[in-house]
């Protein structure tokens, strides 16, 4: 009798597979919609959050509110942060898309007005405000996709700090382990054909091969549901003279 495969263990939701969200420092969203046209604050610290790759700025606002916000490139301790309709066009300031000139890089862009920010939040990325229409602002996301958003959606001026992160190698397996552990990822990932027969349907044998068809039905039981699940087609497709 075989053991539970990795997918079945993950489905139980034990601490091995859950992200340690109790260590995360902030939910990271814009302030509530400002009642006045401008609120200012001072950056008192730059912090690291295990939940994300980008650094966070600890901002003390004049109205007594203190919160962590996404830190764009160029923002340092002691800088002034402005939030509101009449904020200046400077890195770190937050305002509606209607008040931002075309061609300015922005980050932490809202999808719907007041949702706190959904787009361009990873380290080193930014979106670009392309143009203003009558009832929409056209924004190019880091993926290249064009989105028509409400002019009332807010965004932060600048590029998210921490760029070049993906260019630096992990060097040691321990570094990769700690990175994956902080997000709840299971690592390393072992191939099924490299396992023993008791651990995976594709395991065992004198050589590494599945030993059975890889295509399985959508209704396959969990312990056998591995490989190409409900695949429409398999193989290399264009071989055999097909157009």
Curated annotation (Swiss-Prot):
PROSITE patterns: RIBOSOMAL_L2. GO terms for biological process: cytoplasmic translation. One of its GO terms (cellular component) is cytosolic large ribosomal subunit. Residues 221-231 have a biased composition (Basic and acidic residues). Gene3D superfamilies: 2.30.30.30, Nucleic acid-binding proteins, Ribosomal protein L2, domain 3. One of its GO terms (molecular function) is rRNA binding. InterPro entries: NA-bd_OB-fold, Rib_uL2_dom2, Ribosomal_uL2, Ribosomal_uL2_arc_euk, Ribosomal_uL2_C, Ribosomal_uL2_CS, Ribosomal_uL2_dom3, Ribosomal_uL2_RNA-bd_dom. Keywords: Ribonucleoprotein, Ribosomal protein, RNA-binding, rRNA-binding. Transmembrane segments: none annotated. It holds the Pfam family Ribosomal_L2_C. Residues 198-243 are annotated as: Disordered. One of the primary rRNA binding proteins. Required for association of the 30S and 50S subunits to form the 70S ribosome, for tRNA binding and peptide bond formation. It has been suggested to have peptidyltransferase activity; this is somewhat controversial. Makes several contacts with the 16S rRNA in the 70S ribosome. HAMAP family: Ribosomal_uL2_A (MF_01320_A). Part of the 50S ribosomal subunit. Forms a bridge to the 30S subunit in the 70S ribosome. NCBIfam families: PRK09612.1 (NF007180). Belongs to the universal ribosomal protein uL2 family. This is Large ribosomal subunit protein uL2. It comes from Natronomonas pharaonis (strain ATCC 35678 / DSM 2160 / CIP 103997 / JCM 8858 / NBRC 14720 / NCIMB 2260 / Gabara) (Halobacterium pharaonis).
């Amino acid at each position: 009798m075989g053991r539970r495969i990795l997918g079945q263990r993950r489905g139980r939701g034990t601490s091995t597979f859950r992200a340690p969200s109790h260590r995360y420092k902030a939910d990271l969203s814009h302030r509530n919609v400002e009642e006045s046209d401008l609120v200012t604050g001072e950056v008192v610290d730059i912090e690291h959050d295990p939940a994300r790759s980008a650094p966070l700025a600890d901002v003390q606002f004049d109205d007594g509110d203190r919160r962590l916000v996404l830190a764009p490139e160029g923002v340092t301790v002691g800088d002034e942060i402005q939030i509101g309709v009449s904020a200046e066009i400077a890195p770190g300031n937050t305002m509606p898309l209607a008040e931002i000139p075309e061609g300015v890089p922005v980050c932490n862009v809202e999808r719907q007005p007041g949702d706190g920010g959904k787009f361009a939040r990873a380290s080193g990325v930014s979106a670009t405000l392309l143009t203003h229409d009558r009832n929409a602002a056209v924004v190019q996301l880091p993926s290249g996709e064009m989105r028509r958003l409400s002019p009332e959606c807010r965004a932060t001026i600048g590029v998210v700090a921490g760029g070049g992160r993906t260019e630096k190698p992990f060097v040691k397996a321990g570094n990769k382990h700690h990175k994956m552990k902080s997000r709840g990822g299971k690592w390393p990932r072992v191939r099924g054909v490299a396992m023993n027969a008791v651990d995976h349907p594709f395991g065992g044998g004198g050589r590494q091969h599945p030993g059975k068809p890889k295509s399985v039905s959508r209704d396959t039981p969990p312990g056998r549901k591995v490989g190409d699940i409900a695949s429409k087609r398999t193989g290399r497709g264009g071989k055999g003279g097909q157009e």
